[in-house]
Amino acid sequence: MRDASNQRSSRRLTLFTRLTMASEKIRNPATDHLLTPENSMFIVIDYQPVQVASIRSMPRDELVFNIVSATKAALNYKLPIVHSTVNVKTGLNRPAINELQELLGHLPTYDRTTVNAWEDTEFKEAVKGFGRKKLIMTALWTEVCLAFPALDAIQEGFEVYAVVDAVGGTSVAAHETALRRMEQAGVKLISRVQLYCELQRDWARKDTVPGFMNVFENHDGFNAEKAFQESNQH
């Protein structure tokens, strides 16, 4: 009797496991309201040494870590990427920080004189050329080079997602005020971790899982997943 009861319990557990691990089919990216690798693109604006040095809304090492991590997410999920700098060709500014050049050096960089990237024709044509309506935007400063193109893109019918912990301003007040203004205009605020998880969404999508593991990294060096694995070895 006990063996029969154990067998029934085992069958129920197996059935429960199968039921709880049945993933839905991947949604149609054309109609999915969430970010997917097929319906979104990634924009990086003005992560140059002077701009990074002027950030006062968060620790600069954390900012650099977060923009590098967000960029790695875009590369992992093969998003179209548009990278822009300001005033490099005029000699008034330096190229993007080395950490981003290492990741994006194989892509075109659209250098501008306009403060608002959306008012640069080459930049705007590059963005529109990919034909995607969901724009994941990162830029320095939040209150200028992120806010201006984000507000313009919203006016032209795009959906804009600002990665709030991968951008920064000249003060906490400037950063937060710009985020409020953008949100009031319809910009959607997301975080670095949310970006990774929204693009991945299912551990069964194994091709991107190795890159997805970067979601557990932190700027202070702590990795929760690695710490958990190490604790299980003792």
State what each model feature region is.
Residues 6-20:
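Short, Lys/Arg-enriched N-terminal segments with co-localized hydrophobic residues
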Residues 18-114, 129, 159, 174-183, ...:
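Active-site acidic carboxylates
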Residues 93-100, 123-124, 149-151:
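Distinct, well-ordered alpha-helical segments
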Residues 112-125:
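Short phosphate-binding loop-to-helix
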Residues 114-115, 165-168, 195:
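Short, acidic/turn-prone active-site loops that include or flank metal/cofactor-
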Residues 127-133:
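Glycine-rich phosphate-binding loop signature in dinucleotide/nucleotide-binding domains
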Residues 134-186:
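A contiguous pocket-lining binding segment that forms or flanks enzyme active sites
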